[in-house]
Design a protein with these regions (language model features):
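Conserved class I S-adenosyl-L-methionine
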Residues: 18-27
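Conserved SAM-binding loop of SAM-dependent methyltransferases across substrates and taxa
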Residues: 28-41
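Conserved SAM-binding motif I beta-strand of class I
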Residues: 43-48
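Conserved SAM/SAH-binding beta-strand->alpha-helix loop
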Residues: 50-52
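C-terminal substrate-binding/active-site "lid" region of AdoMet-derived donor-dependent transferases
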Residues: 105-155
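An accessory alpha-helical subdomain
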Residues: 167-229
């Protein structure tokens, strides 16, 4: 989509047509402005907790002449919204733990939301587990390469489904089912990060004898099994 890099274009692709969108973490309001310019959304509220990005987003919206379609608010996550204002939420470019906290803290607002579009920077397994534990499921996922990095984008919809096994929470259940071209690179990256964490424990005999060290070894083995299909 014009004006968006590959990462944000992948996020935009999952936003439902005609959505009333909240974009948490404004980033100059790039995502809602691009969607509004294409007529893809009914309206949007861009939220940022920091004054600098908030002001930058306000300037971008004014410059684009989109103030009637895109509102910018200063606030912490979903706390800047009233229940019923939006039916879709996008959170991109934050750690999975931070996204999980934003969603957990915004339970009242999420009651009226049907779609979540999430792009976690790490800790995606924790985020996926939270979604399945809290009445959501992963409907679609994509992998995109941008700036030499791989990014995961998740589309979650309301509705409880069976929670995938831990290794698929790490990889992505839809990614595993669809096996896109970048999947092996994605799994190899996960293995590298787990190995690095385990290597950091090897200098301590107590750590090597602990349950956490063994659990990381089991996680590596489970991921390596998924490299063969």
């Amino acid at each position: 989509m014009q004006g968006l890099d590959e990462r944000l274009a992948a996020v935009a692709a999952f936003v439902p047509l005609g959505a009333r969108l909240a974009d948490i973490g404004a980033d100059h309001a790039k995502l809602p402005l691009a969607l509004a310019a294409k007529g893809k959304i009914a309206r949007a509220i861009a939220v940022d907790v920091n004054e600098g990005p908030f002001e930058a987003a306000r300037r971008a919206v004014r410059a684009a002449g989109m103030a009637q379609l895109v509102e910018v608010r200063l606030g912490d996550g979903l706390a800047a919204l009233a229940p019923g204002e939006v039916d879709a939420v996008a959170v991109a470019g934050m750690g999975g733990s931070s996204i999980t906290r934003i969603l957990a803290d915004g339970a009242a607002v999420l009651q009226a939301v049907e779609t979540l579009v999430l792009q976690p920077q790490g800790d995606a397994a924790e985020l996926r587990a939270w979604l399945y534990d809290n009445g959501w499921h992963i409907a679609e996922e994509s992998l995109v390469r941008a700036g030499g990095r791989l990014y995961e984008v998740l589309l979650a919809r309301r509705g409880k489904k069976e929670k995938p096994e831990p290794v698929l929470l790490a990889i992505g259940p839809c990614l595993w089912q669809e096996k896109p071209p970048l999947l092996k690179k994605h799994i190899e990256g996960l293995i590298f990060r787990v190995r690095r964490a385990r290597a950091g424990m090897e200098k301590s005999a107590r750590a090597r004898d602990g349950a956490a060290y063994r659990a990381l070894g089991e996680k590596i083995a489970a991921l390596e099994e998924k490299l063969i299909w």
